[in-house]
Regions:
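Short acidic, glycine/serine/threonine-rich loops at helix termini
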Residues: 51-55, 78-80, 110-116, 155-161, ...
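Predominant activation on well-ordered alpha-helical scaffold segments within soluble catalytic domains
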Residues: 23-26, 51-58, 86-93, 127-134, ...
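Short, glycine/acidic-enriched loop or turn micro-motifs at the edges of active sites
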Residues: 46, 105-109, 117, 194, ...
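Short hydrophobic/aromatic-enriched beta-strand-loop microsegments
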Residues: 61-68, 119-124, 164-172
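Phosphate-binding and adjacent anionic-ligand microenvironments
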Residues: 99, 136, 140-310
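Active-site flanking residues adjacent to catalytic metal/cofactor-binding acidic residues
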Residues: 42-45, 103-105, 147, 190
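Gly/Ser/Thr-enriched, mixed-charge loops and adjacent short helices
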Residues: 1-95
Length: 310
């Protein structure tokens, strides 16, 4: 490099970052909704939300019980938080809480647990937001909801048939969802795993923000958590991991071809993809009829194994 005249960046430590963030979150709340004061259990996943999340919900008048809020640099996401809600489910039931929120280590994912201890995944959280926005006339078929190829077909049917909203699927990963949201000017997207993107407030996933907005909707509906999320039935799914030993030098064109096969039953869906981290072909079959799901699973598993043996 001959010319050394170029700008360099610098790092600045932001004073009271958590305080500023708290004020931002509070600024997103709808002043026209009287929020119910709830008994909430928070599973912070021994991660980034361990301190700020309990403080925010407490400041808003909720009774807060926190678990997995003692990070030591090693225990992050270890059988807790959005990765594993078993502890949260038990605590919600034991404490007779109204709702439970599970965050992952970096706080960008949210999984909800209702008052009965039942897990509510990202699909159903997005469905709740879509239903709410439809009532407010803030979304329509021109602005689709963006999720990934992993989202349940029952969720897609609910959006289209009940709300008249189209669903568009991206590749797995919240970054891919965000890109598609920008392309289609969408205000709502996310992943089944709990990334929820409310682009009117933030251009990336934010678990605490999503949790606050969930409480708003539950308050407005004046329903329990379980009744608020009683929107649709997820279709049964069957997942099969098919291992292979040979190095796959081909681009696995057969996977693309199998995914393009049109199923006669519109209430069925298949997804076949190569794992990016392990020598596995992942097969997902879902549909309204569990017997057909099992039938299609066996059929496609056999086809894949035959292809891999060639």
């Amino acid at each position: 490099i001959n010319n050394f005249e170029f700008n360099t960046g610098k790092a600045i430590r932001l004073q009271d970052a958590s305080g500023r963030y708290s004020e931002f979150l509070k600024s997103t709340l709808d002043k026209h909704i009287k929020v119910k004061k709830l008994k909430i259990v928070l599973d912070c996943g021994n991660g980034a939300t361990y301190e700020i999340a309990p403080n925010i919900f407490w400041e808003l008048g909720h009774k807060v019980i926190s678990i997995n809020n003692k990070p030591n640099g090693i225990n992050i996401n270890q059988s807790c938080g959005a990765v594993d809600v078993s502890q949260l489910s038990k605590k919600v039931v034991d404490e007779k809480a109204d709702i439970g929120f599970a965050f992952d280590g970096d706080g960008d994912r949210l999984i909800v647990v209702d008052e009965k201890g039942m897990e509510i995944d990202g699909d159903k959280i997005i469905a709740l937001f879509a239903t709410h926005l439809t009532k407010l006339n803030k979304t329509n078929s021109k602005f689709p909801v963006i999720t990934t190829v992993m989202s349940n077909l029952g969720f897609e049917k609910y959006l289209l048939n009940k709300l008249k909203i189209k669903l568009k699927r991206s590749s797995v990963g919240d970054i891919n969802v965000i890109k598609e949201m920008g392309k289609f000017n969408s205000i709502l997207g996310g992943e089944q795993s709990g990334h929820i993107i409310l682009s009117n407030f933030s251009k990336t996933g934010d678990g605490i923000l999503a949790a606050l907005k969930v409480i708003e909707i539950i308050s407005k509906n004046n329903k329990t958590t379980s009744k608020s999320f009683r929107l649709y039935e997820s279709f049964p799914q069957n997942k099969v991991n098919i291992s292979y030993k040979k190095v796959l030098t081909k681009n696995l064109k057969f996977i693309e071809n199998l995914n393009k096969e049109k199923l006669k039953d519109k209430n069925m869906r298949i997804l076949i993809r190569k794992s990016g981290t392990e020598p596995l072909i992942r097969l997902l079959v879902e549909g309204r009829d569990i017997n057909k799901v099992q039938e299609y699973s066996k059929y496609y598993e056999k086809k894949i194994r035959i292809k891999l043996e060639k």
